[in-house]
Amino acid sequence: MARQPTKKTGPKKQKKNVPNGVAYIQSTFNNTIVTIADLNGEVISWASAGSSGFKGAKKGTPFAAQTAAESAARRANDQGMRQVQVMVSGPGAGRETAIRALQGAGLEITLIRDITPIPHNGCRPPKRRRV
């Protein structure tokens, strides 16, 4: 009978005490990714609709964005985060829902900024859907 391989454990993640930071919400038509970082840009926690257990077209829904934001906010709360500035990017359905979920999870929102990149007539957009 073969021996079971032993699991190597790396260094444990230390609990930081970071009172305020920045929450980046990247909301596309297919997914929503919420990343919470400290003011230096070091990532404290992140979650996406896919990592929260949604698959396929359900990842693009507002409920999936809410679940992802709650998950990221809970982990940031464990690290001691209380206040966040919110940077929202992208055209997706989960933008406002994710912001409300961050607020509901106990994070105080001090600023909301839309950082969606807008082309000055750059690449040609995809053709319109005909359903």
UniProtKB/Swiss-Prot annotation:
GO terms for molecular function: rRNA binding; structural constituent of ribosome. Belongs to the universal ribosomal protein uS11 family. Pfam families: Ribosomal_S11 (PF00411). It comes from the Bacteria. This is Small ribosomal subunit protein uS11. The gene is rpsK. Signal peptide: none annotated. Keywords: Ribonucleoprotein, Ribosomal protein, RNA-binding, rRNA-binding. GO terms for biological process: translation. Coiled coil: none annotated. Part of the 30S ribosomal subunit. Interacts with proteins S7 and S18. Binds to IF-3. It comes from Trichodesmium erythraeum (strain IMS101). GO terms for cellular component: ribonucleoprotein complex; ribosome. Located on the platform of the 30S subunit, it bridges several disparate RNA helices of the 16S rRNA. Forms part of the Shine-Dalgarno cleft in the 70S ribosome. Disulfide bonds: none annotated. InterPro entries: Ribosomal_uS11, Ribosomal_uS11_bac-type, Ribosomal_uS11_CS, Ribosomal_uS11_sf.
